[in-house]
Amino acid sequence: MSSPVATVSFLRSIHLLFTNVTQGYSKAGKGECKGAPTVDGYNTPTNLKAAINAPYIQKNGQNYDTYNGMRLFNTNPYDPSLCAAACESQTQFDKEHLVDANGEYKPCNFFTSYILTKNGVPLGTYCALYTQSWDESYAVNTGYYYGEDEYSVICAASYSDSTPDTGKITETVVV
C-alpha cells in the first residue's frame, strides 16, 4: 500500500493507467459479479450499479468535498479489506497531519470499492474514500472514455464504517 503522503495529491479526475491485472470478484462475463464480501468494522456492504459521484455539501457555510482520496491495488485479487485499511490509514494520517484551526480533519467513514477495466480488461481494485456515507442514488459513475479507450466501473460496492469518526480532535483537560 502506498503511503498517505504519496496519495494526498490525487484528485478525483486523475486518469491512471496500469498494466497489472487483478481478477477481482468478477465472474466470466463482463459486468457479472458476485455479491460484495463483508469487511470487519464496516456495516453490510451495498452492491452498486456504478461508482459514487458525491456532490459538495455545505459545512460551516462553505462548500465541502466529502471525497477524501483514492487507492488502486493492481497486484492483488479483489479484496475490499485493502480499501478498509486504506480508509483507516487515511483517517490516521489526516488526524495526525491535516487538522485545521478548528481542530477538524477529514475522516474516512465510507468507501466504495470496484474493479476498473480498460477495454474490458481488469486493471485493479479501485477504492474511493469519503468522509460520509452516500446512498446508491449517487452511484452514477459508470466510467469514461480516454481517447479510443473505454474505462469502465464494474463490481462496485459501498462500505460504511460501523463506528464513524467525528473528524474532530478532542482535548483532554487535566485537573
Question: What is each of the regions a protein language model found here?
Answer:
Residues 1-109, 155-175:
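Conserved small-residue hotspots that stabilize compact domain segments
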Residues 1-9, 103-139:
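Disulfide-stabilized extracellular beta-strand modules
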Residues 94-103, 116-120, 143-147:
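Low-complexity, polar-biased intrinsically disordered regions enriched in Pro/Ser/Thr/Gly
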Residues 131-170:
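Extracellular juxtamembrane "stalk/stem" segments on the ectodomain side of transmembrane proteins
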